[in-house]
Amino acid sequence: MSQANKIYFEDRSIVTPGDLIAEGEFQVPWSPYYYKVNGKYYSAITGLITVKDGSIFEVIPLESSRYYPKVGDTIIGLVEDIEIYGWVIDIKSFYSAYLPASSLLGRPISPGEDVRRYLDVGDYVIAKIEAFDRTISPVLTVKGKGLGRIPLGTVMDIMPVKVPRVIGKNRSMIEVLTSESGCEIFVAQNGRIHIKCANNLIEEALIEAINIIQSESHTKGLTERIRNFLKQKLGVIRNDSAPKTEANT
């Protein structure tokens, strides 16, 4: 980092709109959460600043329910409308996305073919952002392993900015959630989570744990607290559901 470059906040500090974050020339990607004026970077939101190696910074919104699309992101979308050649998909963004039928079918749609046979309003899909440049709506693709319609399980919503905390550093949090619950869990980058559990009680406990992560994401020691919470909660559930043996008389 150049001697002229300076970051004015420590890692994991809170910034508010108008705060001077840094000064100089930094190789940071475009973001809607800060702006640059005459070599000075200012926060556009109330958020958390992360600093890496003293030379790279990022501003993360503390409260945001909207997802900003990025090409290559894997998302969970909700079919909200049907068009002749594809589907309009809600991706929890200011933009609705479009999924061409040809991406799902692997061929062009035939004249008069009813695409509702493949996806209907209310269905969820796992997809990737294939194209987006802020001048057109995001275009999705479901070509690839693990992509396509979600047939089973539950989809829950969290704030997109909380996704990194639910996954955890080196996937530490998601591994705790998976190993303790035994559920299949997929966290999409737009703040939707697909879960499949053995029963509803385990699912409810897992959802409660994820909501705790979302509300306490800024606190330290959260991973171990979640591990202990699930051990206790699921231990009670599993003991209550275990077959009871009659005492000898």
From Swiss-Prot:
An annotated GO cellular component: exosome (RNase complex)
PROSITE patterns associated with the record: S1 (PS50126)
Main localization category: cytoplasm
A GO MF term: poly(A) binding
Domain KH, first and last residues per copy: 151-213
Subcellular location: Cytoplasm
Keyword RNA-binding carried by entry: yes
Family: Belongs to the RRP4 family.
PANTHER family membership: EXOSOME COMPLEX COMPONENT RRP4 (PTHR21321:SF4), PNAS-3 RELATED (PTHR21321)
Subunit structure: Component of the archaeal exosome complex. Forms a trimer of Rrp4 and/or Csl4 subunits. The trimer associates with a hexameric ring-like arrangement composed of 3 Rrp41-Rrp42 heterodimers.
Record function comment: Non-catalytic component of the exosome, which is a complex involved in RNA degradation. Increases the RNA binding and the efficiency of RNA degradation. Confers strong poly(A) specificity to the exosome.
Protein name (Swiss-Prot/TrEMBL): Exosome complex component Rrp4
Species the sequence originates in: Sulfolobus acidocaldarius (strain ATCC 33909 / DSM 639 / JCM 8929 / NBRC 15157 / NCIMB 11770)
Lineage per the UniProt record: Archaea, Thermoproteota, Thermoprotei, Sulfolobales, Sulfolobaceae
